Amino acid sequence: VLLSYQYESGNWPSSLPPGKDRLVQVCHGAPGVINSLLSIKDHFPKLQSRIDSAIRKGRECILERGLLTKESCLCHGISGNALALDDEHCQHFLSYTTGHEMKGLEKDGLVEKSDNPEGLWCGEAGRAWAWAIIDKGLPKRLLGYNDI
């Protein structure tokens, strides 16, 4: 059923019943669904090609619309979106989350500050998690969601 909700754009609804195709972030949209599909796809061999197609289409949506203006966190920021992408595009997205880039984006008013900057899902700890797993070559998983 989940696969049938994918929009033509590659995104998924942010809530049900489906409405506007608007949010592209882990907590609402393609990045979260892709992370889920990547975790379960081996358990559904008969759906493998449909799942792979949905992931491919969802990643195209993230590449087009996933460089967000919210602080770079796991839940609704660039770091979380990066973890749903292939390695090359993940690195590209994470290049926007370096300390230098973040300061520049903040200075230019292009990034909204988090209400919870120390938090895991909505703050700096999530950005650190994303960088750590990429640096160590670990599977791209979301801490506390599909990391076990």
Give residue ranges: language-model regions.
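Broad hydrophobic/π-residue packing in well-ordered secondary structure
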Residues: 1, 11-14, 26-28, 41, ...
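Glycine- and aromatic-rich loop/turn segments at beta-sheet edges
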Residues: 3-24, 59-76, 99-117
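Histidine- and/or cysteine-centered catalytic micro-motif in compact active-site loops
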Residues: 17, 36-39
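Cytosolic regulatory protein-protein interaction regions
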Residues: 22-34
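Periodic glycine anchor positions in long extracellular repeat architectures
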Residues: 29-32, 77-80, 123-126
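Terminal, non-catalytic domain-edge segments
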Residues: 39, 43-45, 57, 61, ...
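C-terminal structural cap/anchor segments
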Residues: 48-88
